[in-house]
Amino acid sequence: MIIPCIDLMDGKVVQLIQGREKALEGGSPLEMLARFAAFPQIQVIDLDAALGKNLDNDSNDSLVELVASRCIARVGGGVRSPERARALIEQGAYRVIVGTAAFDREKLTGIANAVGRDRLIIALDSKGGKVVTHGWREATNFTAEEVIRHLEPYCSGFLCTYVDKEGMLEGTDLDWFRRLRAATSHELTAAGGITTIGEIKELHKLGIHAALGMAIYTGRLNLAELALLNA
């Protein structure tokens, strides 16, 4: 499955390079939903919340709710408490994505209990070979391949981002995704640098979904062609 991404920052749809440099702004969330109407699921990431900004009074909340109420949406960014996870479900999110909190056993258990493991996706973001957290700003000392099996009991799938190539339109690391596929039977979604139809087809052979951002916002990949692949 191909999953278009809507990333929100300061109330706008944006695309970043490696989670830091803003590369472009898209249309409004409703305009993006109209463009992505042929796709069964949309991924929504609140970048401000992921970076720890305005967690208690997030300016993007109304936009997240707007999108989630109009499509089947997986929503993430700054989900670090059971209350936040539950609120997103109540706003219309079909599934919730948890990153940083997945590495705090108490928080992860609380979130999984709050929304149910079937509605929980854990984000495993890799940079320089190691898992990174807190909006990709803090590195751990372990790899995604090492921890993925330990996290399986808490979720129904993983969103795995190859941060080294995120937003750079230079292709992703298919070998990394092959190793992840060998490490778990859980649902996997690949993100980070996916630029060609060939990469998407290779991921499909592995049984891995593709979350796409920069490649579709820049027109590198054609939405009509992607929709046919998704059919």
What does each of the following model-derived ranges do?
Residues M1-C5, Q41-V44, I72-R74, Y94-I97, ...:
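Structural preference for beta-strand elements that scaffold enzyme active sites
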Residues L8-K22, A93-E166:
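Conserved anion-binding
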Residues G19-A37:
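Short catalytic helix/loop segments, enriched in acidic residues and glycine
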Residues R35-A37, I89-E90, L151-E152, H204:
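Non-catalytic positions within long, well-ordered alpha-helices that form the structural scaffold/packing
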Residues Q41-S59, T100, C160-L169:
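Glycine-rich, proline-tolerant flexible connector loops at the mouths of alpha/beta enzymes
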Residues L55-V64, R137-E146, E170-R179:
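Charged helix-capping and loop-helix junction motifs
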Residues L63, S69-R95, D175-A210, L226:
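Catalytic cores of alpha/beta
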Residues E106-V115, L120, I200, H204-A231:
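C-terminal helical cap(s) of enzyme catalytic domains, especially alpha/beta-barrels
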